[in-house]
Amino acid sequence: MAGASVKVAVRVRPFNARETSQDAKCVVSMQGNTTSIINPKQSRMFLKASFDYSYWSHTSVEDPQFASQQQVYRDIGEEMLLHAFEGYNVCIFAYGQTGAGKSYTMMGRQEPGQQGIVPQLCEDLFSRVNVNQSAQLSYSVEVSYMEIYCERVRDLLNPKSRGSLRVREHPILGPYVQDLSKLAVTSYADIADLMDCGNKARTVAATNMNETSSRSHAVFTIVFTQRSHDQLTGLDSEKVSKISLVNLAGSERADSSGARGMRLKEGANINKSLTTLGKVISALADLQSKKRKSDFIPYRDSVLTWLLKENLGGNSRTAMIAALSPADINYEETLSTLRYADRTKQIRCNAVINEDPNARLIRELQEEVARLRELLMAQGLSASALGGLKVEEGSPGGVLPAASSPPAPASPSSPPPHNGELEPSFSPSAEPQIGPEEAMERLQETEKIIAELNETWEEKLRKTEALRMEREALLAEMGSPGGWRTVGVFSPKKTPHLVNLNEDPLMSECLLYHIKDGVTRVGQVDVDIKLTGQFIREQHCLFRSIPQPDGEVMVTLEPCEGAETYVNGKLVTEPLVLKSGNRIVMGKNHVFRFNHPEQARLERERGVPPPPGPPSEPVDWNFAQKDWLEQQGIDIKLEMEKRLQDLENQYRKEKEEADLLLEQQRLYADSDSGEDSDKRSCEESWRLISSLRDELPPNTVQTIVKRCGLPSSGKRRAPRRVYQIPQRRRLQGKDPRWATMADLKMQAVKEICYEVALADFRHGRAEIEALAALKMRELCRTYGKPEGPGDAWRAVARDVWDTVGEEEGCGGGGGGGEEGARGAEVEDLRAHIDKLTGILQEVKLQNSSKDRELQALRDRMLRMERVIPLTQDLEDDNEESGLVTWAPPEGSEAVEEAVSNDHSPAVRPSSPPQSSWERVSRLMEEDPAFRRGRLRWLKQEQLRLQGLQGSGGRGGGLRRPPARFVPPHDCKLRFPFKSNPQHRESWPGMGSGEAPGPQPPEEVTAPPPPPNRRPPSPRRPHRPRRNSLDGGSRSRGGGSTQPEPQHLRPQKHNSYPQQPQPYPAQRPGPRYPPYTTPPRMRRQRSAPDLKESGAAV
């Protein structure tokens, strides 16, 4: 039995009254064990899955394919009960949306033929026990009943239990509930009574605390023990089986159920439990399919999964029943349930027989002896010869131990068996150090467990009887006479009474309150019928039962002052005569139906017509609530419209705030043409859409988003004509290096929802699936993550579909289509996507290789430019010496050296820079644009010179000249590098291709050069760029005939004083290499030379 898969069955129920009133259509079909569901909006799209059992209960009993309660039990219940007798742990749990039929399948009704799996299994259990019981074989049965509500555990069989119980995990026993009552039973009647008592306690607690039973998980556990005596060895062995019958809470959405406030919080806790259960099932399925690298299973994330740890993927034989609604209005919930069940099929449980290890060893040896005997007899050995082996087998050296020498009991150090196997013993030194308080608590808990294990069967029966008496006293105190024998099963034939109504059919009509002759008081203190709750007063109301002369008993309801009491939805302030079938609401949560059997019989005999109203609708909790809302003047439709309007106004307000924030961020970051604005818009849109989706269904979300629009930064978006290779995305609030697959899935969901919303929700399911596959592959490659499981994109597409839904009216008809049409279309689309993705990857690789080549060439060019000026500068340093000055002082000896190195006959005269300083000062004062540009340029030059001085100080005597300036890509030239004629002459200029660096000093008395010739400059640190205006033969071949203006002398300034002042001389030391002018300055400086040349010509 080890390694068996979980049994999965699906069952579809008939239409209920709400679905019938809305003219719902059936979208679920079954053929054999295959179940199919069709999308009501796109009939060609359907889901088909195969399960172990598919039960069609949508029609009536006359249908030959109809699955009754007995058939469901024969297929699932009998098999699980057989495993329990074999010694395995067993679990059956039902899952589905609210109202899908889980409680009916598990519990059923009291009518014959309507009982569910739990009553039938319990009845069949005791039937087999009575048949198989003998002197060598005995049985014992213990039961417990608990409820998990909002992650709190309550004991439903112990009236003294107050509050929630604590869930703990023992290293040997596994997870268990501390102080949970475990009651001994001897017959099916005892179990039925305990289940009724548990349902009553559940109903009372739910009504008093304003809870809904469909929002709580109920776990009914049966501990079945088999004790056998082996006559051969004289040993007693036990096999213990735990049967867990779980009725999960209904899975529902806040928008479909209208949950708000506390109901929404309850739903969040239920969704937490069910979501954790789904995570556990997915993790176990991935573990079986070898898709999961880690063995961690999140059992402890919720109380439900923690308690079901052994039943899910552990030591248990498990079966799941998925309850389905056939209506098209519940398509999304039904589809989710089917996917849930399909994942559960992949789980495999390793179940073992729970028995003593010695007994197991003896059993295995006996089976071996029997097999060898059959083998010897098959070979022709007589039975008389085999009989002589018994003495040898009983000897110490034989196969079986002798009866006179039973095996020694296990030592205290060896722990009891767990799941049929011995756990390794833990030495005290291996255990972690614990504090004294924890040690004392653990000691008390261990002593309590030992006391429960050593408790005799008679003591357990006495404990069960004591708890039964306490429950009877509690029910009598509440005003429910008749005890536990009649409540919820029998109703009085003549006495008027009240029957409770509840949203859950399992908890409805299980509490009965008699109205005695005379006065029956209702309230919280000193009353006959005790109710508790926020809106129940100490003296709430009273019932007067007065016999009439004709024998009829008339019951009158008299409310107390200030107490809220409603009859058929109307507030009662004066005494009112009750009729059989009236709906009574006391406070806000206690709903009852008044039954008067004798009055109803007399009316039928008199032929009194029934009261007006729909005769087919039963008088249940929904009918009472609807009646109460209508009489109170509360129109549900108007309330929903008002709520939608409020949500729309809130969305508009948040959108305006998001628009303002995005506009501020765009202006601050100055990224109108980048993609940062789109990223921020995507995040804000996802925030608003997800918050709106938590409150409303997808179609309503689409309507509001279409009407109000999406958040935008004001940037005009150009339509994308071709697919663009995406840039690297930034995950919000997380380092991309630590991004997980869940983060990538969430990012893909955000981007796809944003694109779908931008396209006015025109995407169909196939397009969303294609986008999901492309986005996931794209994100995985971008962040260097493995693509992981092949169905990761399916989860993304499902989340997108659940968030944005489908456009209203799209996906029209077209009939049923062929069975594999959708699959073929998806495969073709996926192949096309793979092809496009491959092309994009090749283009990306080519672009990256070209970028690498360009970068290598750029680095090589920069290295060459650094080497060439350094060689020329070294030659100049060997020839020149002296101080480097920025302004040419008089009487400098370096002039002669400069003249000797120059091939020109004369040296250029030096002119005082007074005119240049005056012009610069005038422009600085008059032209603000010139002032800003010059200050910006000077700041850059100061930073450059500081860097040169710092590197020169560290490098010693020689220093490499700065490399040629390479402007960044797509960088616009800013002022002062503009072709403005009035600014050109203000910049200190120099000869063609000469850098404005430090020059050797010149004599003032040197003769001027000839006017018709410009001497060539022997010192050029580098060759100008070919595209510059001062480079090439045009500036060097045809020299200018005009003498060089005085304001074109090289000049450097650190400040802008009002009067021109020469720069002080530098400190003596290693001279600096000539300064290399950026290309932009040379292009601007060449313009005056061109003008002079043109004027001369």
Curated annotation (Swiss-Prot):
Residues 397-434, 897-921, 946-1097 are annotated as: Disordered. SMART domains: KISc. Residues 520-587 form the FHA domain. It is found in: Cytoplasm, Cytoskeleton. PROSITE patterns: KINESIN_MOTOR_1 (PS00411), KINESIN_MOTOR_2 (PS50067). Keywords: ATP-binding, Coiled coil, Cytoplasm, Cytoskeleton, Methylation, Microtubule, Motor protein, Nucleotide-binding, Phosphoprotein. The modification Phosphoserine is found at S294, S491, S671, S673, S911, S1028, S1086. The modification Omega-N-methylarginine is found at R1036. Residues 404-418, 997-1015, 1059-1077 have a biased composition (Pro residues). GO terms for molecular function: ATP binding; ATP hydrolysis activity; cytoskeletal motor activity; microtubule binding; plus-end-directed microtubule motor activity. Residues 1086-1097 have a biased composition (Basic and acidic residues). Residues 1016-1026 have a biased composition (Basic residues). Residues 949-958 have a biased composition (Gly residues). SUPFAM superfamilies: P-loop containing nucleoside triphosphate hydrolases (SSF52540), SMAD/FHA domain (SSF49879). GO terms for biological process: anterograde neuronal dense core vesicle transport; microtubule-based process; retrograde neuronal dense core vesicle transport; retrograde vesicle-mediated transport, Golgi to endoplasmic reticulum; vesicle-mediated transport. It comes from the Eukaryota. Probable motor protein. This is Kinesin-like protein KIF1C. It comes from Rattus norvegicus. The lineage of its organism: Eukaryota, Metazoa, Chordata, Craniata, Vertebrata. The gene is Kif1c.
